[in-house]
Amino acid sequence: MENLLAMPVRPIEVMIAKIVPYIAIGYVQVVLTMAISSAAFDLPVRGSLFLLIVALGLFIASNLALGFTFSTIASSQMQAMQMAQFTLLPSILLSGFMFPFYGMPKWAQWTGEIFPTTHALRVVRGILLKGNGAAEILPELWPIAAFTLVVGAIAIWAYRETLD
């Protein structure tokens, strides 16, 4: 980090440089998961794989922006990991992944709508199982994009140019 701080770069440039490799890793995970799911479980793919990859890229970016935000506001690596764990479990439990979304209490549904995981699951299910196109998934993409922009802006704003 000391080398980055010594360079004449803006916080947004540091953020992009740190996030881009992880986006590539996220795409590798998506491709491997899709390949294994198709081969081992005969997962149907009724929609556009290209559309799925683009939509999941936004989801990957939203999670990386959240992680970057945690790392900028945390005072230690341990604190950043605890923040990540604190949001991981609710995002999975309230997304509709483990329990039917509309079977949850209203407060849980409202809370679940905040997390990008909820919308990403709807996109994945829509594209893979229903063959949804761009028009059908757009209502699920804008909340992910808004989350990414807000959380990314917080990360840039909170970025410290010193090591404290």
Task: Give residue spans per PLM region.
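Short cytosolic juxtamembrane segments of multi-pass membrane proteins
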Residues: 157-164
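Hydrophobic alpha-helical interface/terminus motif in multipass membrane transporters
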Residues: 1-4, 36, 40, 70, ...
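Membrane-interfacial helix-loop-helix junctions in multi-pass membrane proteins
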Residues: 44, 96-150
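Hydrophobic transmembrane alpha-helices
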Residues: 23, 53-61, 83-101, 108-117, ...
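Alpha-helical transmembrane segments and their short interhelical loops
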Residues: 11, 15-85, 89, 135-141, ...
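Positions in alpha-helical segments
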Residues: 2, 68, 106-109
